[in-house]
Amino acid sequence: MVKDFSAEEIIQYISDAKKSTPLKVYVNGVLGQVTFPDSFKVFGSENSKVIFCEASDWEDFYNDNKNYIEEVEIEMDRRNSAIPLKDLRNTNARIEPGAFIREHAVIEDGAVVMMGATINIGAVVGEGTMIDMNATLGGRATTGKNVHVGAGAVLAGVIEPPSASPVVIEDNVLIGANAVILEGVRVGEGAIVAAGAIVTQDVPAGAVVAGTPAKVIKQTSEVEDSKREIVSALRKLND
């Protein structure tokens, strides 16, 4: 389902999705005669199991078999979740531990998503783009190629309240740490957004903007090359 979602389509998708509360359950006991439901994924030995199941299914199972269960430990990291995390097995990018990337986000080749970054449903991370630590791409936010989104920066989503126009970051843009790009804003190719800026209007290609609200302060041609370099070595994957 890789497509350009509208906000309304995402809202409908979330509304219609079967909500899930998955559990990981560690069980010790006399389990050799216990019959596990087909909906369970069960691993382990006769007297010690690891079970993956839905919370509602576990309650019924436990009540029926608690006389056989001696010890139990339950891990739960979500409740009534509508959107699972993205399956990254076929993603040709560098994804670091602790990044949260939701299903139906697009991560293009050679991208980098750092620890703590959040990529919401419908967002697009372009080829060779780096999403730095704790940055957020809200629903439908889109980056082009070779963009750097600095640590803690926010590209606002357009799911709630629904907005027709997502944030669009064109190719070769640098966004400083803790900058905020508001809904509907387009940042033109090669522009630079200073750290901490709040961008409320479109940014022309090649402009440098700073402040709250952000305003053009100069052109990127006036910035040293070393301060706007995209380092290809950081995007290198295994040969």
Curated annotation (Swiss-Prot):
Pathway: Amino-acid biosynthesis; L-lysine biosynthesis via DAP pathway; LL-2,6-diaminopimelate from (S)-tetrahydrodipicolinate (acetylase route): step 1/3. Keywords: Acyltransferase, Amino-acid biosynthesis, Diaminopimelate biosynthesis, Lysine biosynthesis, Repeat, Transferase. PROSITE patterns: HEXAPEP_TRANSFERASES. Its EC number is 2.3.1.89. Gene3D superfamilies: Hexapeptide repeat proteins, Malonyl-CoA ACP transacylase, ACP-binding. It comes from the Bacteria. It catalyses: (S)-2,3,4,5-tetrahydrodipicolinate + acetyl-CoA + H2O = L-2-acetamido-6-oxoheptanedioate + CoA. It is an enzyme of class 2 (transferase). GO terms for molecular function: tetrahydrodipicolinate N-acetyltransferase activity. One of its GO terms (biological process) is diaminopimelate biosynthetic process. Catalyzes the transfer of an acetyl group from acetyl-CoA to tetrahydrodipicolinate. Belongs to the transferase hexapeptide repeat family. DapH subfamily. This is 2,3,4,5-tetrahydropyridine-2,6-dicarboxylate N-acetyltransferase. The gene is dapH.
